[in-house]
UniProtKB/Swiss-Prot annotation:
This is Zinc finger Ran-binding domain-containing protein 2. Belongs to the ZRANB2 family. Residues 196-210, 251-273, 297-314 have a biased composition (Basic residues). Residues 117-330 are annotated as: Disordered. InterPro entries: Znf_RanBP2, Znf_RanBP2_sf, ZRANB2. Splice factor required for alternative splicing of TRA2B/SFRS10 transcripts. Binds to ssRNA containing the consensus sequence 5'-AGGUAA-3'. May interfere with constitutive 5'-splice site selection. Residues 150-163 have a biased composition (Acidic residues). The modification Phosphoserine is found at S9, S120, S153, S181, S188, S193. One of its GO terms (molecular function) is zinc ion binding. The modification N6-acetyllysine is found at K18, K54, K92. The keyword Repeat applies. GO terms for cellular component: nucleus. It comes from Rattus norvegicus (Rat).
Length: 330
């Protein structure tokens, strides 16, 4: 059969023998070349396109021939010598794939392949990488490794031979023999009464000491209040003496003026005697009112009591001079 006139149709199959690879018609049950029977391993052929034929070739007016084929996927018309489509690369004769209906979803085939991984204590893992605990250690000779192992074994033996005194179980007997006087529940009532009396005495002592300290602390406060009351009384007496002296000076001035106006023609010794007689009871009143409480306050009051006398003398002198001038004019 010539290759030019060979046409693949749906259902044709390829011989499963790799050395043969002959394409047989769909109606054959055995290979036409090697005689091997058709099995399930034989792959079915599928035509990727169909020939256009003479009618379409005549309509193309010499552009295509009857052997040219049209692709089934993109419907492009390809030359007969092409084994693949010029547009979508679909093969002219393709192997028919099994239609299983599997789309590749999760657990679609129901036969999931589990990879069994064995965890070993080796130096390398399943991917051939060195484990972390072995990365920092330098590989030394076998003698050094043996020494390290011997040291580790000796350390374990020492740990086993440690002092086990803290794990002794015979300590309970020693505790039973200890002094149990503090746990005596049959103590007499006299001891309890003595303890109560001692507690009461200590409390009374603490209260008495507290009252003494409070009385001591209150004494300076009382002395302060007394000193404040004294200072206030002295200040009030000073203010009273000031007001009395001012009133006395005012009364003197008014009396002198009235006497000068009414008795211009009278003599001066009468005026002096009148002023001295009028001022003597007022001075006695001053002295009775302002009795100093301390020597410093007495000095201050003496100086203040002298000042109105000077004022009175000056006023009397002025009145005397006025009376003299009036007598001369007469």
């Amino acid at each position: 059969m010539s290759t030019k006139n060979f046409r693949v149709s749906d259902g044709d199959w390829i011989c499963p023998d790799k050395k043969c690879g002959n394409v047989n018609f769909a109606r054959r049950t055995s290979c036409n070349r090697c005689g091997r029977e058709k099995t399930t391993e034989a792959k079915m052929m599928k035509a990727g396109g169909t020939e256009i034929g003479k009618t379409l070739a005549e309509k193309s007016r010499g552009l295509f021939s009857a052997n040219d084929w049209q692709c089934k996927t993109c419907s492009n018309v390809n030359w007969a010598r092409r084994s693949e489509c010029n547009m979508c690369n679909t093969p002219k004769y393709a192997k028919l794939e099994e239609r299983t209906g599997y789309g590749g979803g999760f657990n679609e085939r129901e036969n999931v392949e589990y990879i069994e991984r064995e965890e070993s204590d080796g130096e390398y893992d399943e991917f051939g990488r060195k484990k972390k605990k072995y990365r920092g250690k330098a590989v030394g000779p076998a003698s050094i490794l043996k020494e390290v192992e011997d040291k580790e074994s000796e350390g374990e033996e020492e740990d086993e031979d440690e002092d086990l005194s803290k794990y002794k179980l015979d300590e309970d007997e020693d505790e039973d023999d200890a002094d149990l006087s503090k746990y005596n529940l049959d103590a007499s009532e006299e001891e309890d009464s003595n303890k109560k009396k001692s507690n009461r005495r200590s409390r009374s002592k603490s209260r008495s000491s507290h009252s003494r300290s409070s009385s001591r602390s209150s004494s300076p406060s009382s002395s302060r209040s007394r000193s404040r009351s004294r200072s206030r009384s002295s200040s009030s007496s000073q203010s009273r003496s000031h007001s009395g002296s001012r009133e006395h000076s005012r009364s003197r001035g008014s009396k002198s003026r009235s006497s000068s106006r009414s008795h211009r023609g009278s003599s001066s010794p009468r005026k002096r005697s009148y002023s001295s007689s009028s001022s003597s009871p007022e001075r006695d009143r001053k002295r009775s009112r302002s009795r100093p409480s301390s020597p410093a306050v007495r000095k201050k009051r003496r100086t203040r009591s002298r000042s109105p006398e000077r004022h009175h003398r000056s006023s009397s002198g002025s009145t005397h001079s006025g009376s003299r001038s009036s007598s001369k004019k007469k």
